[in-house]
Amino acid sequence: EKKNLWLHVDACVGGYIAPFVRMNGADIPPFDFKISAVKSISADLYKYGYCAKGASTVLFRDQTLYQYMIFDCDNWPGGRMITPTLAGTRPGGAISAAWAVMNYLGVAGYREKQKQVTDARQAVEQGVTQLGFDILGSPQLGIVAFSHPTLDVYAIYQKMFAKGWFSGLTTEPKALHLMLSPFHMSVIHTYLEDLAASIEQVKAGETGTVGEVRYS
């Protein structure tokens, strides 16, 4: 605010879960328009909004700021072209589907879905801690990462992959990385059983190699 800079919040993953987790009683730190310097927020509907891919949102503090998003060009032979974004023609199916999902779930539906997510995350945290893993940071929403103080996490991942579990990995530090959904609560018990078995395999000397691909 002192520098009169536009502060944008990239809430593409957490934007449609954090407000409802807060409504459910969790102490979620301010990240949104509660902070006076925040001018805009992006949040993907296809993640924790549970909508089809192809629909996302950008929110502005007030209507006057929206003008800076509009693409307005007349420096070409086709005449003046104005679109809400840099993109031209976009299919409306994903937008219509998002409208239907959001109206169907409503605030109560989203609160229930996000409670299922945080319940699943807490169950994972408890289970992996009992297996000797260390939780990275202090998860509050639907993502959790955990490392092991003595075992090769990538070797454990390889064993889990062979059992049909396709999760993410982090590199610094090495950790298993999960993005949980309401469905996952029903499979956590099986996941933890397979994780325990994978640990025993690695302890017994069954190791392998895991290639590295970075997302940027």
For each feature predicted by the language model, list its residue ranges.
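Active-site-proximal loop/turn and secondary-structure-junction residues that shape catalytic pockets
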Residues: A11-G15, K47, P173, P182-H184
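Non-catalytic terminal extensions of PLP-dependent enzymes
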Residues: R111-Q114, T118-E125, T129-L131, G137, ...
